[in-house]
Design a protein with these regions (language model features):
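Class I SAM-dependent transferase core
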Residues: 2-95, 103-106, 111, 124-127, ...
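Conserved nucleotide-cofactor-binding alpha/beta core module
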Residues: 87-185
């Protein structure tokens, strides 16, 4: 019985690895994602850690998935395109608005020196912290609060990314951006 279970687990792991590789091949062949650092981060972070268990088999499907509180984890292509546009460097400090389940913050954690992410739903902030711990990411701080206010205490930030839909950029976020920084919404 234990051998069958182990074989099933290994089969699922191989399937997910193949799904990841298929997405990376698609992004490379289409020249959609050209940053090797971002592609490497995608391969390193297990997206299945950040989705509900019932959706683990869809972790690498290129569409959003529900994460609770009527929120979703963005589809992988959207996440990767935003990260590429953000042009994060290893020495950067990044502020993310909209932590969700923590997946984007985990990728940012591999790309940047330090990440602060703000989530308005306390339950999702707790989930993001747990998911980041599970993924072994230690340079990301998850705050629960109003992302429109940013995080003045730890500013300025080299990069600010708003992962939720926003009609306009709140002034506090602009004020917390470092000189020559990039703010993406």
């Amino acid at each position: 019985m234990a051998v069958l279970f182990q074989e099933e687990v290994h089969s699922h792991l191989r399937k997910r690895q193949k799904q990841k590789q298929t997405l990376v091949r698609y992004w490379k062949n289409s020249r959609m994602i050209t940053s090797e650092r971002i592609l490497k981060a995608f391969m390193e972070i297990p997206r299945e850690y950040f989705v509900e268990t019932s959706f683990a088999d869809q972790a690498y499907a290129d569409h959003p998935l529900p994460i609770g509180e009527e929120q979703t984890i963005s589809q992988p292509t959207t996440v990767m395109l935003m990260l590429q546009l953000l042009e994060v460097k290893p020495e950067h400090r990044v502020l993310e608005i909209g932590a969700g389940c923590g997946y984007n913050a985990a990728l940012l954690g591999l790309l940047a020196k330090e990440v602060v992410t703000i989530e308005r739903h306390e339950k999702l902030a707790v989930l993001a912290r747990a998911n980041l711990r599970k993924a072994g990411i230690s340079n990301v701080t998850v705050l629960a609060g109003d992302g429109k206010l940013g995080d003045l205490e730890h500013s300025p930030y080299n990069r600010i990314i708003v992962t939720a839909a926003a009609q306009n950029i709140p002034v506090p976020l602009k004020d917390q951006l470092a000189v020559d920084g990039i703010l993406l919404s």
